[in-house]
């Protein structure tokens, strides 16, 4: 058997059975040796076939040329030398028999050990084939199935993430539009507030102008009243002076009375026309100023009312936009929180899937290590079996050498005992043996060992001729 390195080596194993016959009574038995690689001992080892048998209890000498049995004569012989040689030979044979029995026991133990190792080898080979054919495929199938599930879940999570990102982008655009609208409304509000401040300033200026005009009107009215009073006093003074002059100058008055009266009437009419004209001009100026101020006040009041309405409307719009922005901000925060939760969940699931993949890889590595260990054990068993086969072959050669060495004194002892014989012819006996040979071939193909077994039946015929002493 050669080392498994790609060359084909065959190992033939057969079963052996020990048979022990009765102890020899007269003389040591003979050993029959077959021409094949198997050997059989007439006293120690029997053939594997049930048809083979061994006869014990008679000493057989060398086979005669004609196959006839030679018998000793009935006369008395001198067996003193033969008895001494026989005793010495018996002692030697007993020692050799004991050694052969020990060798036979060891050989039987080796055979049992080889059978046990073959059974273990077959079991390990079955486990190895099962592990090689099923476990890696099943582990690979489980890994591929889990990887497909992980890829499908990753795709689902990726689509969900894309959808959430699209929603987030849409909400971000809506939020940006609302922020821009809010900025525009805030700018409009600021413009309205600025216009309101300007309008308030104009109203204040108009109010101050109105108050100033009212004060001017009051001063003019006071001046008119003062002028009226002054005119009346002048008229009274003039009348008093005229009356005094009338008392003093009665005659003069009598002569100039019509001219003075006419002059007084003219002066009165002139002053009255001047006063009426001044009063009318003051009233018209006051009315025009009052109308202008009233129109300005009305215009300012209307502008103020419109500004207040616009401010209220802007305030309502700002409040509604603020509420809408707050709602959108809350929605955005909820979506961001949901996105973070999805990312965390995705990270956890990805970590779990990576841990599962690592666990499966570790199991696959352990299975590969176990397969390698089984292969090493199988190789060690093959090495042990090869060593046992070598040892068995060595013991076989030793037994064959001992058998050939022991057969020499038997022939010499038989030649000493034979003198004159009367030949009696007996038919030769043939022993048929059938042996089942198990041929196991171990080949190495692409780094893998392939073991094939076959059984072969061998037939052998052993001619046995009776011998006598």
From Swiss-Prot:
Per its UniProt entry, which superkingdom is the organism in? Eukaryota
The record's Gene3D superfamilies line, in alphabetical order, gives: 1.20.5.170, Single helix bin, Vasodilator-stimulated phosphoprotein
Annotated region (Coil 1B), positions in chain: 143-238
- PTM notes: Phosphorylated; phosphorylation increases after nerve injury in regenerating neurons.
Q: Where is the IF rod domain?
A: 96-406
Give the start-end ranges of region Linker 1: 132-142
Residue list for modification Phosphotyrosine: 469
Tell me, what does this protein do in biology? Class-III neuronal intermediate filament protein. May form an independent structural network without the involvement of other neurofilaments or may cooperate with the neuronal intermediate filament proteins NEFL, NEFH, NEFM and INA to form a filamentous network. Assembly of the neuronal intermediate filaments may be regulated by RAB7A. Plays a role in the development of unmyelinated sensory neurons. May be involved in axon elongation and axon regeneration after injury. Inhibits neurite extension in type II spiral ganglion neurons in the cochlea.
Protein's UniProt name: Peripherin
Q: Which organism is it from?
A: Bos taurus
Report which gene this protein is encoded by.
PRPH
